[in-house]
């Protein structure tokens, strides 16, 4: 089997808490940028595990269309606010098996208890052991006067999206109000593909991921890749002899990376061409071959003759060339 290029993953940008990240994947065989980008995006948008509120219980309220005396917001608005809670549930302390076997009457409940005028925020929620609210500044409701508010909040783990109707079937209690659950920890994910030309035309995949804090952006890509990999493994097992075949060629990439990191001093250019490239900030072969012929021609004091010289040196020494216009 003809081998494919082995690619590298580099971080372009990450915020301090790593909930947002921009990553570059290259070099990919032409066409694989869209193939990988689309597959990863679809998995991240729909199939990553997370946690979410699925129901709540409000003292004195039996349905979502009621009002709490002394509270500015109606119950519908309170529910909309609570839907935005980012709830973390410890894997070590509370397993999926425990949650699936726990009846709603014994569920570990997060609580709001207030009786003074003011804004109630997510940071005011009392959490049981193994639960934590991440977005503590989220406003839940406003007490316009001294009034009693008692809210029990139920959260669990899951994947994707579940409607209130789906959650209702698992609750079985009229006093508990089911709500929609969005378990996906991804806020946004996008990608685009750029073409790169050196000795061959390759794809460069740029992926941008933002999360709600339950997962790091880099981990989101890793988990999505693991989900895809495990779904493909049974298909590979149709022909088990394929396990011994190396599909990605590591040597080619290592050699190419060495070529690209070579300083332009080693091209043995004329003094004029060398000085012009240096003044323009071009230090390595990679910075040179990612530019087109017209870009190099437009550098001050360079022209078509210099471009021919540079291309000749790249070809003779490293089997590389400038990008076509």
UniProtKB/Swiss-Prot annotation:
It catalyses: RNA(n) + a ribonucleoside 5'-triphosphate = RNA(n+1) + diphosphate. Its EC number is 2.7.7.6. It comes from the Bacteria. This is DNA-directed RNA polymerase subunit alpha. Pfam families: RNA_pol_A_bac (PF01000), RNA_pol_A_CTD (PF03118), RNA_pol_L (PF01193). Homodimer. The RNAP catalytic core consists of 2 alpha, 1 beta, 1 beta' and 1 omega subunit. When a sigma factor is associated with the core the holoenzyme is formed, which can initiate transcription. InterPro entries: DNA-dir_RNA_pol_insert, DNA-dir_RNA_pol_RpoA/D/Rpb3, DNA-dir_RpoA, RBP11-like, RNAP_asu_C, RNApol_insert_sf. Transmembrane segments: none annotated. The N-terminal domain is essential for RNAP assembly and basal transcription, whereas the C-terminal domain is involved in interaction with transcriptional regulators and with upstream promoter elements. The lineage of its organism: Bacteria, Bacillati, Mycoplasmatota, Mycoplasmoidales, Mycoplasmoidaceae. Belongs to the RNA polymerase alpha chain family. DNA-dependent RNA polymerase catalyzes the transcription of DNA into RNA using the four ribonucleoside triphosphates as substrates. One of its GO terms (biological process) is DNA-templated transcription. One of its GO terms (cellular component) is DNA-directed RNA polymerase complex. Disulfide bonds: none annotated. It comes from Mycoplasmoides gallisepticum (strain R(low / passage 15 / clone 2)) (Mycoplasma gallisepticum). One of its GO terms (molecular function) is protein dimerization activity. Residues 255-325 are annotated as: Alpha C-terminal domain (alpha-CTD). Residues 1-239 are annotated as: Alpha N-terminal domain (alpha-NTD). The gene is rpoA. Keywords: DNA-directed RNA polymerase, Nucleotidyltransferase, Transcription, Transferase.
């Amino acid at each position: 089997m003809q081998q494919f290029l082995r690619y590298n993953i580099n971080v372009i940008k990450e915020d301090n808490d790593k909930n947002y990240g921009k990553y570059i994947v290259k070099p990919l065989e032409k066409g694989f940028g869209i193939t990988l980008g689309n597959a990863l995006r679809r998995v991240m948008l729909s199939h990553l595990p997370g946690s979410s509120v699925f129901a709540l219980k409000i003292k004195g309220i039996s349905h979502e269309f009621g009002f709490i005396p002394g509270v500015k917001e109606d119950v519908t608005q309170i529910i909309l606010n609570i839907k935005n809670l980012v709830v973390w549930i410890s894997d070590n302390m509370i397993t999926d098996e425990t949650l699936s076997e726990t009846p709603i009457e014994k569920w570990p409940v997060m609580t709001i208890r207030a009786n003074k005028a003011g804004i109630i925020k997510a940071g005011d929620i009392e959490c049981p052991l193994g639960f934590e609210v991440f977005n503590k500044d989220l406003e839940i409701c406003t007490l316009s006067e001294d009034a009693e508010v008692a809210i029990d909040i139920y959260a669990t783990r899951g994947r994707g999206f579940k409607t209130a109707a789906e959650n209702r079937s698992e609750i079985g209690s009229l006093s508990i109000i089911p709500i929609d659950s969005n378990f996906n920890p991804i806020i946004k994910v996008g990608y685009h593909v750029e073409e790169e030309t050196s000795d061959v035309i390759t794809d460069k995949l740029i992926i941008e991921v933002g999360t709600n804090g339950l997962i790091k952006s880099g981990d989101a890509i890793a988990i999505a890749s693991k989900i895809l990999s495990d779904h493909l493994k049974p298909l590979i097992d149709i022909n088990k002899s394929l396990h011994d075949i190396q599909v990605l060629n590591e040597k080619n990439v290592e050699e190419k990376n060495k070529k690209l990191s070579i300083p332009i001093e080693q091209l043995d250019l004329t003094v004029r061409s060398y000085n012009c490239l240096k003044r323009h900030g071009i230090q390595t072969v990679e910075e040179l071959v990612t530019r087109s012929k017209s870009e190099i021609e437009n550098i001050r004091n360079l022209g078509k003759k210099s471009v021919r010289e540079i291309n000749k040196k790249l070809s003779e020494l490293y089997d590389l060339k400038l990008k076509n216009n």
